[in-house]
A protein has these predicted regions:
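Conserved acidic/glycine
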Residues: 5-8, 13-14, 18-22, 40-42, ...
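Glycine- and Gly-Pro-enriched alpha-helical subdomains that act as flexible
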Residues: 15-35
């Protein structure tokens, strides 16, 4: 019984290459057997590996594999659908009898005019020109080359930074 041992949620972000590795099968099988309900794997399914499209070496039904392991399996059809992602996380937090796999369909290099959905977006820098074109695609300023908009920075500092500092202080006090 792991109820008392682990009283917090554990999240892991996994990609196509991770699902191709044997260790993911072994770990997932054990997690299902032990009914580790605090465990949530988010599978970024963009169908691309560093070598190329997953169809080169991977054709299994990941959802069926994890269902066979006893996992709760959910699908989010669009990685940019924040409402669907939030709903999937809520279902995970209410699941008390097994681990959860959330399969999220995405596009690697999303918004890059020449590299979206290619393995070059996985294992290579976009390059200055492709970065400029991608920023134009997003209607972002092209200069400076690295930019975090003030609103994003402020939101992160307020929601993540402040909360993280509070949680760290509470953890350190125990």
């Amino acid at each position: 019984d792991f109820e008392d041992l682990v009283d917090f949620d554990v999240y892991s972000l996994c990609g196509d290459g991770c699902m191709m590795e044997g260790i993911s099968s072994e770990a997932a099988s054990l997690a299902g057997h032990l009914r580790l309900s605090k465990l949530c794997w988010i599978y970024d399914s963009n169908r691309i590996t560093i070598e190329g499209h997953t169809s080169l070496a991977f054709s299994e039904d990941v959802a069926a594999r994890f269902e066979a392991y006893g996992w709760n399996v959910m699908h989010v059809a669009d990685a940019n659908d924040q409402a669907a992602l939030s709903q999937a996380f809520e279902v995970f937090r209410r699941t008390s009898d097994r681990p959860t796999l959330i399969i999220v369909s995405s596009h690697i290099g999303w918004g890059s005019p020449h590299k979206q959905d290619t393995n070059s977006a996985h294992g290579e820098p976009l390059g200055d020109e492709e970065v400029r074109l991608t920023k134009e695609n997003y209607s972002w300023p092209t200069e400076p080359s690295f930019l975090v908009p003030d609103g994003v920075y402020d939101c992160f500092a307020d929601r993540i930074g402040k909360r993280g500092a509070e949680l760290c202080a509470a953890w350190s006090a125990t």
